[in-house]
Swiss-Prot record:
Protein name: ATP synthase F(0) complex subunit a
Lineage: Eukaryota, Metazoa, Chordata, Craniata, Vertebrata
Family according to the record: Belongs to the ATPase A chain family.
Single biological process term from Gene Ontology: proton motive force-driven ATP synthesis
Organism: Alligator mississippiensis
Predominant location: mitochondrion
Cited SUPFAM superfamilies: F1F0 ATP synthase subunit A
Function summary: Subunit a, of the mitochondrial membrane ATP synthase complex (F(1)F(0) ATP synthase or Complex V) that produces ATP from ADP in the presence of a proton gradient across the membrane which is generated by electron transport complexes of the respiratory chain. ATP synthase complex consist of a soluble F(1) head domain - the catalytic core - and a membrane F(1) domain - the membrane proton channel. These two domains are linked by a central stalk rotating inside the F(1) region and a stationary peripheral stalk.
Transmembrane segments: 10-30, 69-89, 96-116, 135-155, 168-188, 194-214
Protein backbone atom coordinates (compact mmCIF):
# COMPACT_ATOMS: atom_id res chain seq x y z
CA UNK A 1 0.00 0.00 0.00
CA UNK A 2 1.30 3.43 -0.94
CA UNK A 3 1.05 5.94 1.90
CA UNK A 4 0.58 8.79 -0.56
CA UNK A 5 -2.55 7.30 -2.12
CA UNK A 6 -4.61 9.26 0.40
CA UNK A 7 -3.48 12.51 -1.25
CA UNK A 8 -4.72 11.56 -4.72
CA UNK A 9 -7.64 13.67 -5.90
CA UNK A 10 -10.78 11.48 -5.75
CA UNK A 11 -12.94 11.18 -8.84
CA UNK A 12 -16.35 9.78 -9.72
CA UNK A 13 -17.01 8.61 -13.29
CA UNK A 14 -13.86 10.42 -14.36
CA UNK A 15 -15.00 13.73 -12.78
CA UNK A 16 -12.76 15.29 -10.13
CA UNK A 17 -14.37 15.71 -6.71
CA UNK A 18 -12.03 18.51 -5.63
CA UNK A 19 -14.57 21.31 -6.05
CA UNK A 20 -17.41 19.42 -4.28
CA UNK A 21 -15.01 18.79 -1.40
CA UNK A 22 -14.39 22.53 -1.15
CA UNK A 23 -18.07 23.42 -1.48
CA UNK A 24 -19.01 21.01 1.31
CA UNK A 25 -17.31 23.35 3.79
CA UNK A 26 -19.88 26.07 3.06
CA UNK A 27 -22.64 23.89 4.52
CA UNK A 28 -21.16 24.39 7.97
CA UNK A 29 -21.43 28.16 7.57
CA UNK A 30 -25.14 28.27 6.72
CA UNK A 31 -27.16 29.86 9.51
CA UNK A 32 -30.75 28.80 10.21
CA UNK A 33 -33.37 31.36 9.21
CA UNK A 34 -36.42 32.68 11.06
CA UNK A 35 -35.08 32.12 14.55
CA UNK A 36 -35.72 34.53 17.41
CA UNK A 37 -32.76 33.28 19.42
CA UNK A 38 -29.34 32.60 17.94
CA UNK A 39 -28.19 29.00 17.86
CA UNK A 40 -25.13 28.14 20.01
CA UNK A 41 -23.16 27.17 16.92
CA UNK A 42 -24.00 30.54 15.37
CA UNK A 43 -22.75 32.30 18.49
CA UNK A 44 -19.50 30.32 18.43
CA UNK A 45 -18.97 31.06 14.74
CA UNK A 46 -19.62 34.76 15.29
CA UNK A 47 -17.16 34.88 18.19
CA UNK A 48 -14.51 33.04 16.17
CA UNK A 49 -14.94 35.35 13.17
CA UNK A 50 -14.77 38.48 15.34
CA UNK A 51 -11.63 37.33 17.13
CA UNK A 52 -9.96 36.28 13.88
CA UNK A 53 -10.84 39.58 12.21
CA UNK A 54 -9.45 41.52 15.15
CA UNK A 55 -6.14 39.64 15.09
CA UNK A 56 -5.68 39.70 11.33
CA UNK A 57 -6.76 43.28 10.64
CA UNK A 58 -4.84 44.90 13.52
CA UNK A 59 -1.51 45.25 11.66
CA UNK A 60 -3.18 46.55 8.49
CA UNK A 61 -3.63 50.26 7.85
CA UNK A 62 -7.25 51.54 7.89
CA UNK A 63 -7.12 51.89 4.09
CA UNK A 64 -6.57 48.14 3.80
CA UNK A 65 -9.55 47.15 5.95
CA UNK A 66 -11.72 47.00 2.84
CA UNK A 67 -10.00 43.70 2.05
CA UNK A 68 -11.04 42.14 5.37
CA UNK A 69 -13.93 40.17 3.85
CA UNK A 70 -11.76 38.12 1.51
CA UNK A 71 -9.12 37.50 4.21
CA UNK A 72 -11.64 36.30 6.79
CA UNK A 73 -13.45 34.20 4.18
CA UNK A 74 -10.14 32.60 3.22
CA UNK A 75 -9.35 31.88 6.88
CA UNK A 76 -12.70 30.16 7.39
CA UNK A 77 -12.34 28.15 4.18
CA UNK A 78 -8.84 26.93 5.02
CA UNK A 79 -9.72 26.17 8.65
CA UNK A 80 -12.78 24.11 7.81
CA UNK A 81 -11.05 22.33 4.94
CA UNK A 82 -8.08 21.40 7.13
CA UNK A 83 -10.29 20.22 10.00
CA UNK A 84 -12.66 18.20 7.83
CA UNK A 85 -9.66 16.50 6.24
CA UNK A 86 -8.82 14.93 9.61
CA UNK A 87 -12.06 12.97 9.66
CA UNK A 88 -11.92 9.32 8.49
CA UNK A 89 -12.55 8.60 4.81
CA UNK A 90 -12.32 12.25 3.80
CA UNK A 91 -10.15 14.12 1.33
CA UNK A 92 -8.11 17.20 2.22
CA UNK A 93 -7.88 19.58 -0.76
CA UNK A 94 -5.27 21.72 1.01
CA UNK A 95 -2.74 18.86 0.82
CA UNK A 96 -2.56 19.56 -2.92
CA UNK A 97 0.26 21.98 -3.75
CA UNK A 98 -1.50 23.01 -6.95
CA UNK A 99 -4.52 24.25 -5.02
CA UNK A 100 -2.47 26.08 -2.39
CA UNK A 101 -0.39 27.77 -5.07
CA UNK A 102 -3.57 28.72 -6.93
CA UNK A 103 -4.69 30.54 -3.78
CA UNK A 104 -1.34 32.02 -2.71
CA UNK A 105 -0.06 33.29 -6.06
CA UNK A 106 -3.02 35.50 -7.10
CA UNK A 107 -3.51 36.95 -3.60
CA UNK A 108 0.21 37.72 -3.25
CA UNK A 109 0.20 39.30 -6.71
CA UNK A 110 -2.75 41.48 -5.71
CA UNK A 111 -0.84 42.83 -2.70
CA UNK A 112 2.13 43.69 -4.94
CA UNK A 113 -0.07 45.40 -7.53
CA UNK A 114 -1.85 47.39 -4.81
CA UNK A 115 1.50 48.68 -3.60
CA UNK A 116 2.69 49.56 -7.11
CA UNK A 117 -0.55 51.41 -7.80
CA UNK A 118 -0.96 53.34 -4.54
CA UNK A 119 2.68 54.03 -3.58
CA UNK A 120 5.07 52.85 -6.30
CA UNK A 121 8.11 54.64 -4.86
CA UNK A 122 7.72 53.11 -1.41
CA UNK A 123 7.07 49.65 -2.83
CA UNK A 124 10.19 49.73 -4.97
CA UNK A 125 12.18 51.15 -2.06
CA UNK A 126 11.65 47.86 -0.19
CA UNK A 127 14.04 46.25 -2.67
CA UNK A 128 16.95 48.37 -1.41
CA UNK A 129 17.62 48.80 2.34
CA UNK A 130 18.55 52.29 3.45
CA UNK A 131 22.26 53.00 3.80
CA UNK A 132 23.40 50.23 1.45
CA UNK A 133 26.97 50.70 0.11
CA UNK A 134 27.16 51.49 -3.58
CA UNK A 135 28.95 48.26 -4.49
CA UNK A 136 26.29 46.09 -2.83
CA UNK A 137 23.27 47.78 -4.43
CA UNK A 138 22.93 45.40 -7.45
CA UNK A 139 23.40 42.30 -5.28
CA UNK A 140 20.91 43.40 -2.62
CA UNK A 141 18.31 44.37 -5.21
CA UNK A 142 18.65 40.90 -6.75
CA UNK A 143 18.39 39.20 -3.35
CA UNK A 144 15.35 41.24 -2.28
CA UNK A 145 13.65 40.58 -5.63
CA UNK A 146 14.19 36.83 -5.26
CA UNK A 147 12.88 36.90 -1.69
CA UNK A 148 9.81 38.79 -2.90
CA UNK A 149 9.12 36.24 -5.64
CA UNK A 150 9.59 33.33 -3.24
CA UNK A 151 6.79 34.51 -0.93
CA UNK A 152 3.87 32.78 -2.71
CA UNK A 153 5.90 29.58 -3.06
CA UNK A 154 6.66 29.63 0.67
CA UNK A 155 2.97 30.14 1.47
CA UNK A 156 1.84 27.19 -0.62
CA UNK A 157 4.67 24.82 0.30
CA UNK A 158 4.37 25.57 4.04
CA UNK A 159 0.67 24.71 4.13
CA UNK A 160 1.09 21.61 1.97
CA UNK A 161 4.12 20.25 3.84
CA UNK A 162 2.67 20.67 7.33
CA UNK A 163 -0.64 19.03 6.48
CA UNK A 164 0.96 16.23 4.46
CA UNK A 165 3.43 15.40 7.23
CA UNK A 166 0.64 15.25 9.80
CA UNK A 167 -1.53 12.97 7.69
CA UNK A 168 1.39 10.62 7.03
CA UNK A 169 2.21 10.38 10.74
CA UNK A 170 -1.42 9.64 11.58
CA UNK A 171 -1.57 6.91 8.95
CA UNK A 172 1.71 5.31 10.04
CA UNK A 173 0.72 5.21 13.71
CA UNK A 174 -2.75 3.95 12.81
CA UNK A 175 -1.27 1.05 10.83
CA UNK A 176 1.11 0.25 13.69
CA UNK A 177 -1.74 0.32 16.22
CA UNK A 178 -3.89 -1.99 14.11
CA UNK A 179 -1.10 -4.51 13.60
CA UNK A 180 -0.05 -4.48 17.26
CA UNK A 181 -3.64 -5.03 18.38
CA UNK A 182 -3.42 -8.72 17.37
CA UNK A 183 0.21 -9.33 18.34
CA UNK A 184 0.84 -7.17 21.44
CA UNK A 185 -2.40 -5.67 22.82
CA UNK A 186 -0.74 -3.82 25.75
CA UNK A 187 1.64 -2.06 23.37
CA UNK A 188 -1.23 -1.21 21.04
CA UNK A 189 -2.87 0.71 23.89
CA UNK A 190 0.25 2.83 24.16
CA UNK A 191 0.30 3.56 20.44
CA UNK A 192 -3.42 4.35 20.60
CA UNK A 193 -2.69 6.99 23.23
CA UNK A 194 0.02 8.44 21.02
CA UNK A 195 -2.42 8.45 18.11
CA UNK A 196 -5.05 10.35 20.10
CA UNK A 197 -2.49 12.94 21.20
CA UNK A 198 -1.28 13.28 17.62
CA UNK A 199 -4.84 13.84 16.41
CA UNK A 200 -5.29 16.62 18.96
CA UNK A 201 -2.02 18.14 17.80
CA UNK A 202 -3.10 17.94 14.16
CA UNK A 203 -6.37 19.70 14.96
CA UNK A 204 -4.32 22.55 16.41
CA UNK A 205 -1.94 22.51 13.44
CA UNK A 206 -4.87 22.68 11.02
CA UNK A 207 -6.13 25.86 12.68
CA UNK A 208 -2.68 27.39 13.12
CA UNK A 209 -1.62 26.80 9.51
CA UNK A 210 -4.78 28.45 8.19
CA UNK A 211 -4.19 31.40 10.53
CA UNK A 212 -0.51 31.73 9.54
CA UNK A 213 -1.40 31.60 5.83
CA UNK A 214 -3.89 34.46 6.13
CA UNK A 215 -1.76 36.43 8.61
CA UNK A 216 1.21 36.45 6.23
CA UNK A 217 -1.05 37.67 3.44
CA UNK A 218 -2.29 40.46 5.70
CA UNK A 219 1.31 41.44 6.50
CA UNK A 220 2.11 41.55 2.78
CA UNK A 221 -0.95 43.73 2.30
CA UNK A 222 0.09 46.03 5.15
CA UNK A 223 3.55 46.38 3.62
CA UNK A 224 2.06 47.59 0.33
CA UNK A 225 -0.93 49.61 1.53
Amino acid sequence: MNLFDQFLTPSLLGISLLMPALLMTTILLLNPKNQWLSHPTTTIKSWFINQAAKQIMTPINPTGHKHSLILISLLILLSLTNLLGLLPYTFTPTTQLSMNMAIALPLWLVTVLIGLRTQPTTSLAHLLPEGTPMLLIPILILIETISLLIRPIALGVRLTANLTAGHLLIQLISIATLNLWFMMPPLSLLTSTVLILLLLLEFAVAMIQAYVFVLLLSLYLQENS
